[in-house]
């Protein structure tokens, strides 16, 4: 699988506007994605906006599902996030996705992120 991260948000759109997402495959069912926090990602309190982190997680998980589905279009149906800490400018957020089950119509996975 790929050792280096690749930019996945190269088309115009929301994630490119927010700085893009770096992504790599660890195995057929495991993937990693990352982003480095900059000033555009901060909320009024000076920490990373939860909306940006949610979008990052959704993009990373969506790309993993897309790859696992043989590059078929995929959408997020449910996303549950628990924030347990804050991040700031310069922090690197790394997400890890592990696909637990997949079939023709759905993909179930667990995802966690750290800085």
Label each residue range with its predicted role.
Residues 1-115:
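Terminal targeting signals and extreme-terminal segments of soluble enzymes
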């Amino acid at each position: 699988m790929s050792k280096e991260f690749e930019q996945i948000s190269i088309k115009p759109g929301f994630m490119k506007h927010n700085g893009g997402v770096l992504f790599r495959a660890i195995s057929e069912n495991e993937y990693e994605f990352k982003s480095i926090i900059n000033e555009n990602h901060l909320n009024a309190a000076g920490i990373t906006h939860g909306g940006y982190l949610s979008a990052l997680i959704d993009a990373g998980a969506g790309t993993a599902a897309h790859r696992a589905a043989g590059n078929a279009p995929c959408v997020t149906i449910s996303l549950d996030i628990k924030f347990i800490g804050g991040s700031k400018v310069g922090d690197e957020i790394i997400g890890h996705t592990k696909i637990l089950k997949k079939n023709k119509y759905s993909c179930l996975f667990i995802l966690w992120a750290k800085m």
